[in-house]
Amino acid sequence: MNKKVSKTLLSTVLIGLVLSQQAVEACSAFIIGKGLTKDGSFLYGRTEDYPYPHEDGTQEHTHNKNFFVNPAKDYKEGDILLDKSTGTVYPHLKHEYKYTVVADDSRDSNEGIFSEHGFNEHGVSMTATVTATPRSEVVGGKAPKVAADGRVLEGPENEVEYPAIDPLVKAGVTEAIVTDLILPRVKTAKEAAQLLAKEIDEKGSAEGNIIVFADKNELWYMEIYSGHEYVAFKYPDDKYSVFPNTYFLGKVNINDKENIIASKGIIETAKKAGVFVGDESKGEIDLAATYAPPLERGDRSRVYAGIKLLNPSSNVTFQDKRYEFLQDSPRRDFTVIDGLNVQRNRFETLNGELVPDDQVPGYDTKTDAYRKQADPSDPNYGKYAYAQETKM
């Protein structure tokens, strides 16, 4: 299918890199640690690919985005930030920082703002979100049985109804509001993760999500598993990751307060749901084994293709039961172009293992794709690449 690429050049503290773009189908993201890049910067990015539904049953396949600059502002007591998608209100701080976002052009509708990514004046950037489906054993609902060999058993006779241990909270934090809630209030990536953790502790989460925060020194990766359970992880310099719409973070020790921010019930909730994998006595939990549902083929194909693209010598296969979140690479010269290559990959690099997804019938979605760099050499310098793809 032919597509037209709409390219936007952005400046201020941002440098826009205008790049032609084809993106993989569905929401996917990547991180490349600063120890693996040519210029010593963190690289991360995400593609958003979602056919927005309308009330009349039709779908919008070319969903426009707008770039907004929100100036620093002083607020008086009683001023609020409203999440129109839920009706939840968040009191403004007395002073909030300048920040920029790329948001849906329908941001004034009752669906919410949906500022998908942005920077603030302190050099903190974020992307929100890679949507992930919580495990039914935890949040409640139906889920298929899984055979001993890992196969998901199909058919209604193989569905199990689970009670809710920690259900999602309808009025909790959403993708629609999270960027506008976090960016104007923080000075570092860790502060961003801590603030979101605090909001989830107090209000809960309405969705399963994955969010990335970065500043000039650090990058934090956060997974939200249920109404109140989450883990944020300080990303190492010498690894890379590719993650579509499910949870991939593996073994962590929640007692490692320097590198881990974990909800208080992260182990106890999993135990109550009967899904805990780890060693509670040591504070260890395998998060993917505990909180991730069975790996869908669409997620498997994207993570496999991304890993092999960035490291062709990797020994992962399409049949692997799971994929490690932190991947190794012999390269130390990755650039923003490598991030672009991940995003425009359609499996054509897999030597026929998978059909290129633009050849699959029914492929008809819009994509917002962007890459960000956190440059450690300059606290006020953010590099930003953005391309929006629309149907011809």
Segments (PLM) and residue ranges:
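Bacterial N-terminal signal peptides
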Residues: S11-S20
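Short, charged, surface-exposed loops that flank catalytic or proteolytic processing sites
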Residues: R185-K190
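Long, well-ordered mid-to-C-terminal structural blocks that present hydrophobic/aromatic surfaces
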Residues: I337-M392
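A contiguous strand-loop segment
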Residues: C27-T174, L195-T349, L354-V360
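Bacterial N-terminal signal peptides that target proteins for export
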Residues: N2-L10
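Glycine- and acidic
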Residues: A176-L181
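Sec/Tat signal peptide C-region and signal peptidase I cleavage site
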Residues: S20-A26
